């Protein structure tokens, strides 16, 4: 579920 968080952060940035 860590990859999901990274994906979200990348989406925000």
UniProtKB/Swiss-Prot annotation:
GO terms for biological process: defense response to bacterium; innate immune response. The keyword Secreted applies. Its main location: secreted. The modification Leucine amide is found at residue 13. One of its GO terms (cellular component) is extracellular region. It comes from Rana temporaria. This is Temporin-1Tf. Expressed by the skin glands. The keyword Secreted applies. Belongs to the frog skin active peptide (FSAP) family. Temporin subfamily. It is found in: Secreted. Amphipathic alpha-helical antimicrobial peptide with potent activity against Gram-positive bacteria, weak activity against Gram-negative bacteria, and moderate activity against fungi. Also displays anti-leishmania activity by damaging parasite membrane. Stimulates insulin release from pancreatic beta-cells in a dose-dependent manner, without increasing intracellular calcium. Protects beta-cells against cytokine-induced apoptosis and augments beta-cells proliferation. In vivo, intraperitoneal injection together with a glucose load into mice does not have effect on plasma glucose levels. Keywords: Amidation, Amphibian defense peptide, Antibiotic, Antimicrobial, Immunity, Innate immunity, Secreted.
């Amino acid at each position: 579920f860590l990859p999901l968080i990274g994906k979200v952060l990348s989406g925000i940035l």
